[in-house]
């Protein structure tokens, strides 16, 4: 049984000969583990059953500040060095006038997936869209403003969510040309019931 088969069986609540797992680290924790293990490639020795591919593009615009492909600038100079805190407001008004979705680097997505498949053929392949809907919307507008717009400007929120959804569908169309086993959406919304 391959690791891919073990994960698929576990998802279907079927017994497996071992318990599938996947380990991920924040960047500071990753660096701490590299130092602790005295091995820069320690992650490759963990035996994770899952490979996750995520298209993201951050560039440092000043020390500790990173801009994503939507134009959101994340302050990673404080305690949160992994994701950061939004330090700008791309959509400061409830209007999409002048707002353009970022281009999708199809070649980069294909390279990411193909390289992952080549190096991890027996693992469960997961394509991830982090900040998929609600998180992308609040990162563009600001949390408080987006929540207010949901009540005061619902047509704007619908239009914004439609554009984000269309963008994500373009990402999915590319990813689903490959034999990915799962799509992971990174929104933190839901309930415990």
Residue map of PLM features:
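Active-site loop segments of alpha/beta catalytic cores
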Residues: 1-33, 67, 100-193
């Amino acid at each position: 049984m391959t690791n891919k088969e073990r994960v698929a069986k576990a998802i279907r609540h079927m017994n497996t000969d071992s318990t599938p797992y996947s380990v991920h680290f924040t960047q500071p924790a990753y660096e701490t583990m590299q130092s602790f293990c005295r091995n820069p490639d320690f992650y490759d020795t963990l035996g994770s059953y899952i490979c996750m591919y995520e298209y993201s593009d951050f560039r440092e615009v000043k020390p500790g500040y990173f801009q994503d492909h939507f134009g959101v600038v994340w302050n990673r100079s404080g305690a949160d060095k992994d994701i950061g805190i939004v330090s700008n407001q791309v959509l400061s008004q409830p209007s999409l006038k002048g707002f353009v979705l970022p281009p999708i680097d199809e070649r980069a997505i294909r390279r990411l997936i193909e390289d992952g498949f080549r190096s991890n053929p027996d693992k469960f392949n997961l394509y991830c869209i982090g900040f998929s809907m609600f998180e992308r919307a609040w990162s563009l507008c600001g949390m408080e403003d987006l929540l207010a717009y949901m009540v005061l400007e619902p047509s704007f929120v619908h239009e914004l969510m439609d554009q984000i959804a269309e963008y994500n569908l373009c990402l999915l169309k590319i990813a689903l040309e490959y034999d990915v086993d799962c799509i992971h959406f990174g929104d933190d919304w839901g309930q415990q019931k």
